[in-house]
């Protein structure tokens, strides 16, 4: 099951959990109210998983590839890790399925506070278009993920501030309706 919590404000390595003591856990329902969708799947059978195929069909996730994020597999690793950790949004949903390893997606809540979502093997998440977010590997420095898209992939990230985009405006309206 997904683990998520409000992050502490401590400086330091973003690959650490940044879980405050005492913790402030976040449940699936709270993530859903932010538009974040979550599934737990069997990553060992991703190539022939009927549950994954059902999700892809229902949500029109027609394109996919696999990325391995580690120093010896990802060209310009340090540069890419910094880029992934910059707060940004996309004009389309971001869909990731962790096939191996682990990492963190951080998303902003309605009050602009960071919620950290721990992602490990078998976790699949959809972040809605317009949500400010970022990603980092954890201290293991290894994540293998399936990237899914509706139609042709669009890789463009818009660093904050990016409130002028229609996708952001639609997301803010969505948040107001879930209040």
Swiss-Prot record:
Binding-site residues, Fe(2+): 88, 90, 94, 133
Pfam families: ARD (PF03079)
EC number(s) per entry: 1.13.11.54, 1.13.11.53
Enzyme class (EC, first level): oxidoreductase
A Gene Ontology molecular function term of the record: oxidoreductase activity
Domain of life: Eukaryota
Tissues showing expression: Detected in heart, colon, lung, stomach, brain, spleen, liver, skeletal muscle and kidney.
GO BP: L-methionine salvage from methylthioadenosine; methionine metabolic process
Membrane association type: Peripheral membrane protein
Enzymatic reactions: 1,2-dihydroxy-5-(methylsulfanyl)pent-1-en-3-one + O2 = 4-methylsulfanyl-2-oxobutanoate + formate + 2 H(+); 1,2-dihydroxy-5-(methylsulfanyl)pent-1-en-3-one + O2 = 3-(methylsulfanyl)propanoate + CO + formate + 2 H(+)
Nucleus found in the keyword field: yes
Subcellular localization(s) per the UniProt record: Cytoplasm; Nucleus; Cell membrane
Region (Disordered): 7-26
Pathway(s) the chain acts in: Amino-acid biosynthesis; L-methionine biosynthesis via salvage pathway; L-methionine from S-methyl-5-thio-alpha-D-ribose 1-phosphate: step 5/6
One term under GO cellular component: cytoplasm
Note on how the cofactor is bound: Binds either 1 Fe or Ni cation per monomer. Iron-binding promotes an acireductone dioxygenase reaction producing 2-keto-4-methylthiobutyrate, while nickel-binding promotes an acireductone dioxygenase reaction producing 3-(methylsulfanyl)propanoate.
UniProt keyword list: Amino-acid biosynthesis, Cell membrane, Cytoplasm, Dioxygenase, Iron, Membrane, Metal-binding, Methionine biosynthesis, Nickel, Nucleus, Oxidoreductase
Residues annotated to bind Ni(2+): 88, 90, 94, 133
Chief place of localization: cytoplasm
Cofactor: Fe(2+); Ni(2+)
HAMAP family in the cross-refs: Salvage_MtnD_euk
Quaternary organization: Monomer. Interacts with MMP14.
Similarity remark: Belongs to the acireductone dioxygenase (ARD) family.
Biological function: Catalyzes 2 different reactions between oxygen and the acireductone 1,2-dihydroxy-3-keto-5-methylthiopentene (DHK-MTPene) depending upon the metal bound in the active site. Fe-containing acireductone dioxygenase (Fe-ARD) produces formate and 2-keto-4-methylthiobutyrate (KMTB), the alpha-ketoacid precursor of methionine in the methionine recycle pathway. Ni-containing acireductone dioxygenase (Ni-ARD) produces methylthiopropionate, carbon monoxide and formate, and does not lie on the methionine recycle pathway. Also down-regulates cell migration mediated by MMP14.
Protein name in the entry: Acireductone dioxygenase
Species annotation: Homo sapiens
Gene encoding the protein: ADI1
